[in-house]
């Protein structure tokens, strides 16, 4: 359905350090560096960039979208817990601790360093 997702940031290096660590349990890594954006892809498909961290093209401040959330898919509850724990340790804000929601599915919610809402879940 989607070609890729962009997340606006006001501090590309700080945001990259955050996402490089929090995405590690998902086997997603930074594969492209540019002065205005960084690209991330799964380790097994490094040429298929699916996530970009970007300084806004219009050179205005990056702001969060009200009602916008990006959700990552995990292969286990352990990865959900690890993602959440890493995020909190790096300064993310809690938006919902790991646990079952919407039936048995397992979710965790955070706000990244720029205030963007991110989620991780394991379909049960």
Label each PLM-derived region with a short phrase.
Residues 18, 82-83:
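Short amphipathic alpha-helical coupling segments at ligand-binding clamshell hinges
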Residues 9, 31-32, 40, 63-67, ...:
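A structural feature recognizing the 12-helix transmembrane core of secondary solute carriers
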Residues 1, 63-66, 102:
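Short glycine-enriched loop/turn motifs at secondary-structure junctions
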Residues 1-16, 70, 124:
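N-terminal beta-strand motif that seeds the catalytic metal site of vicinal oxygen chelate
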Residues 84-124:
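Vicinal oxygen chelate
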Residues 41-82:
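Long, continuous compositionally biased terminal/linker segments
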Residues 13, 21, 25, 62, ...:
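Charge-dense, helix-prone N-terminal extensions
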Residues 7-49:
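Core segments of cupin and vicinal oxygen chelate
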């Amino acid at each position: 359905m989607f070609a890729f997702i962009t997340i606006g940031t006001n501090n590309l290096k700080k945001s990259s350090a955050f996402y490089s660590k929090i995405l590690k349990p998902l086997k997603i890594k930074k594969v492209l560096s540019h002065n205005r954006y960084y690209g991330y892809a799964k380790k097994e498909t490094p040429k298929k960039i699916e996530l970009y961290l970007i300084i806004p093209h219009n050179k205005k401040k990056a702001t969060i979208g009200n009602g916008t959330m990006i959700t990552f898919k995990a292969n286990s509850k352990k990865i959900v817990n690890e993602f959440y724990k890493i995020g909190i340790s790096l300064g993310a804000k809690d938006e919902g601790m790991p646990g079952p929601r919407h039936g048995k599915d397992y979710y965790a919610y955070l706000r990244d360093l720029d205030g963007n809402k991110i989620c991780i879940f394991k379909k049960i």
